[in-house]
């Protein structure tokens, strides 16, 4: 109940906002929606505007964010990292523009830069003489957290600045790297990468992230940089703090300057001479948000001129020269009717919410993810609760948390069932894992269905024409009990089934038959072994060459492979030790599925790299990492995904992974650039050349013939 006493109400609002700031900025676990948080801030602003005597120095309206976590060293920002005022409609945008003109003068010539407001984690990067020396989070705007080691692992953040002078909009002397440069930007995670990461975490029995922003924030704030290096983080630069040695005049010039130095800058940023044009671009963004590969929660409109920015100044926590045009919330409140559990292909039990239908962003949502039992317990989510439901882009809607204030006492605490809902087997939970599992691997019908769906998926055997409905039909009718049974289907099975005419049946059976000859690593992916995705499957296929050899390998033998850890090795060995797995492999052979690696499509060009193990990091000048890897393999070498004492060379391109470079230096492993790699191949010499700074002229003398070989391998170097 809202108090009529403005003093008490202001104190209450400040405490609520501080608490929610702590949940959002420090714990990365918000418990209210963005719209509800904005409503609290608006009420406090209006209250303080009506009663100026209530404004205190520590009011949330006078600060940014929350105190930093004690987990990392604190960093004092020399130039504060400001927040932004928000506008929620065009009327708010026009009010901001009118205020700007009143301050600058009605005859002022004002240009605007409009940039997408990426929903990630704001960071600052400090470069001295072109070398990254420190990186920190925004924290409360005054003090952040030192996450330098973790930021170094993000490949889109340059460790040393270069010059890309072909950007005509950069300053007149883009080759001069400033002696001091502080770059501000956003660390984020693409939606597709987020979904893949959550799948991996769920399979591993680890805690999943609620959304891409939380995934990015949690990944960046890992204590171990090695963990961060395995997360698909990206970076966009959008501004500067401290700068020495270059006089930047505008925001637009700054964006081009940053791009010229090698920073990724969002190419959807635009400059406009008129406010109405800028506003029209904001409207366009509202219609495009679902088409993007990353989450945005609005657009930022900035006054382009730094001189005008300085004239406008800052009030409280917000610069007067910029505003965030926030998009309508992709959240809604609905009632949680029930919690049902689904069974995954590896037996993981996942709770899902059944809610009263609610429209979120033009889509009717009836079901939402609850991730796992711990997620429900930590947030005290109960059946009958009114809950906040969030949907963003193509990400599955999920429950953020309950609206506790709306409880009436009829809500029920949910408990994870003791047995599998599909087969009745008692559930198990391994020590240290958040996931419950059904151990009835070979018989549980839900696991069978999920495994077949995975087997036919694009990343595995890629069988066209088979989806969830088809698999359900096959299993319900008893035609298919395991993936090998797919290859026993005949036209007679489909006789009399509605929707299955002769042409559709022929296409379906042809697609199944064609999949028998898929590469070995695709088959390994299709088996659905825990922790085994495309990269691990390729390593296993390359080393063992057949399912028989892989099945006969011990966990120790598998663990010895580059890029394979003990958890993966144990999972693979455990899978092939099961009687049902052995029976499945025998059955796959009987129905004609290839269980051995295919011969090389192109005969090896030589053995110049025989016995040598390479790791590739960064962006190479004339070929992708995949193309470089194919070239190494064609000359007898092998490629690994991680640096270890077994690595012979690290091939380094621009913007390399900091962890790999540091590990190579620690182990004394020689590094090569692209020219050095080509020289090593062209010289047909297995001895290690001088590391890193090989003679470019000598390399070029041998590279023409080698590049011709790349073309013969069918590799596109454009």
From Swiss-Prot:
Binding-site positions, Zn(2+): 420, 423, 438, 444
Obligatory cofactor(s): Mg(2+); Mn(2+)
NCBIfam families to which the protein is assigned, alphabetical: dnlj (TIGR00575), PRK07956.1 (NF005932)
GO MF: DNA binding; DNA ligase (NAD+) activity; metal ion binding
Enzyme class per UniProt: ligase
Residues spanning the signal sequence: none
A GO biological process held by the record: DNA repair
UniProt domain BRCT: residue ranges: 604-694
Alphabetical keyword list: DNA damage, DNA repair, DNA replication, Ligase, Magnesium, Manganese, Metal-binding, NAD, Zinc
Pfam families on file: BRCT, DNA_ligase_aden, DNA_ligase_OB, DNA_ligase_ZBD, HHH_2, HHH_5, Nlig-Ia
Name by which UniProt lists this protein: DNA ligase
Catalytic activity field: NAD(+) + (deoxyribonucleotide)n-3'-hydroxyl + 5'-phospho-(deoxyribonucleotide)m = (deoxyribonucleotide)n+m + AMP + beta-nicotinamide D-nucleotide
Function: DNA ligase that catalyzes the formation of phosphodiester linkages between 5'-phosphoryl and 3'-hydroxyl groups in double-stranded DNA using NAD as a coenzyme and as the energy source for the reaction. It is essential for DNA replication and repair of damaged DNA.
EC number assigned by the record: 6.5.1.2
Gene3D superfamilies assigned to the protein according to its UniProt record, in alphabetical order: 5' to 3' exonuclease, C-terminal subdomain (1.10.150.20), 6.20.10.30, BRCT domain (3.40.50.10190), DNA ligase/mRNA capping enzyme (3.30.470.30), Helix hairpin bin (1.10.287.610), Nucleic acid-binding proteins (2.40.50.140)
Residues that hold NAD(+) according to the record: 34-38, 83-84, 115, 138, 186, 302, 326
Active site: 117
Family indicated by similarity: Belongs to the NAD-dependent DNA ligase family. LigA subfamily.
């Amino acid at each position: 109940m809202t108090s009529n006493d403005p003093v008490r109400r202001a104190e209450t609002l400040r405490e609520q906002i501080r608490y929610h700031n702590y949940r959002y900025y420090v714990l990365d676990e918000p418990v209210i929606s963005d719209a509800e948080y904005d409503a609290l801030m608006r009420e406090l602003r209006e209250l303080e505007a009506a009663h100026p005597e209530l404004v205190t120095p520590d009011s949330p309206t006078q600060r940014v964010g929350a105190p930093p976590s004690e987990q990392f060293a604190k960093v004092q920002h020399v130039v504060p990292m400001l927040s932004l005022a928000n506008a929620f409609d065009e009327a708010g945008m026009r009010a901001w523009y009118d205020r700007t003109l009143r301050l600058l003068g009605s005859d002022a010539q004002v240009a605007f830069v409009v940039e997408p407001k990426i929903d990630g984690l704001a960071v600052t990067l400090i470069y001295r003489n072109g070398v990254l020396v420190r990186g920190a989070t925004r924290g409360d705007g005054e003090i952040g957290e030192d996450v330098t080691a973790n930021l170094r692992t993000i490949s889109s953040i340059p460790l040393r600045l270069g010059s890309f002078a072909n950007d005509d909009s950069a300053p007149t002397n883009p080759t001069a790297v400033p002696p001091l440069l502080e770059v501000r930007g956003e660390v984020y995670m693409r939606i597709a990468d987020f979904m893949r990461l959550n799948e991996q975490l769920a399979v591993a029995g680890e805690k999943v992230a609620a959304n891409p922003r939380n995934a990015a924030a949690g990944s960046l704030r890992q204590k171990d940089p090695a963990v961060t290096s395995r997360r698909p983080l990206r970076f966009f630069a959008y501004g500067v703090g401290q700068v020495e040695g270059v006089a930047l005049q505008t925001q637009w010039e700054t964006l081009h300057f940053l791009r010229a130095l090698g920073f990724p800058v969002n190419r959807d940023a635009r400059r406009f001479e008129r406010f109405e044009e800028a506003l029209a671009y904001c409207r366009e963004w509202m219609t495009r948000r679902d088409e993007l590969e990353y989450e945005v929660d609005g657009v930022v409109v900035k006054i382009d001129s730094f001189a005008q920015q300085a004239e406008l100044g800052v009030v409280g926590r917000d610069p007067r020269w910029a505003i965030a045009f926030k998009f309508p919330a992709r959240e809604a409140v609905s009632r949680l009717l029930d919690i049902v559990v689904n069974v995954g292909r590896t037996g993981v039990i996942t709770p899902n919410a059944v809610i009263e239908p609610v429209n979120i962003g033009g889509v009717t949502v009836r079901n939402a993810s609850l991730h796992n039992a711990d997620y429900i317990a930590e947030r005290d989510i109960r059946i009958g609760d009114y809950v906040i439901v969030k949907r963003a882009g193509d990400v599955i809607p999920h429950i953020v948390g309950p609206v506790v204030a709306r409880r009436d006492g009829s809500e029920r605490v949910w408990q994870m069932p003791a047995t599998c809902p599909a087969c009745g087997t008692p559930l198990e939970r391994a020590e240290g894992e958040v996931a419950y599992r059904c151990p009835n691997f070979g018989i549980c019908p839900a696991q069978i269905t999920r495994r077949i769906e995975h087997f036919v998926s694009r990343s595995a055997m890629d069988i066209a024409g088979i989806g969830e409905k088809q698999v359900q039909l096959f299993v319900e009718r008893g035609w298919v009990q395991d993936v090998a049974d797919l290859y026993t289907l005949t036209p007679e099975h489909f006789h009399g089934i509605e929707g299955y005419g002769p042409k559709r049946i022929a296409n379906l059976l042809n697609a199944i038959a064609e999949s028998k000859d898929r590469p070995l690593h695709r088959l390994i992916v299709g088996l659905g072994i825990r922790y085994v995705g495309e990269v691990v499957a390729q390593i296993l296929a390359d080393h063992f060459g057949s399912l028989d050899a892989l099945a006969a390998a011990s966990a120790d033998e598998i663990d010895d492979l580059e890029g394979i850890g003990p958890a993966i090795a144990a999972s693979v060995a455990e899978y092939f030790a099961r009687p049902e797995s052995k029976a499945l492999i025998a059955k796959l052979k009987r129905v004609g599925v290839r269980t051995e690696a295919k011969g090389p499509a192109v005969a090896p060009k030589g053995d110049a790299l025989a016995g040598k193990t390479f790791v590739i990091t960064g962006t190479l000048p004339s070929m992708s990492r995949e193309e470089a890897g194919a070239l190494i393999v064609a000359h007898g070498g092998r490629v690994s995904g991680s640096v270890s004492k077994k690595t012979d060379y690290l091939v380094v391109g621009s913007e390399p992974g900091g962890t790999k470079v540091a590990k190579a230096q620690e182990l004394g492993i020689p590094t090569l650039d692209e020219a050095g790699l080509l020289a090593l191949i062209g010289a047909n010499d297995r001895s290690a050349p001088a590391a890193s700074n090989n003679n470019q002229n000598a390399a070029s003398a041998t590279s023409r013939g080698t590049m011709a070989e790349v073309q013969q391998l069918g590799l596109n170097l454009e």
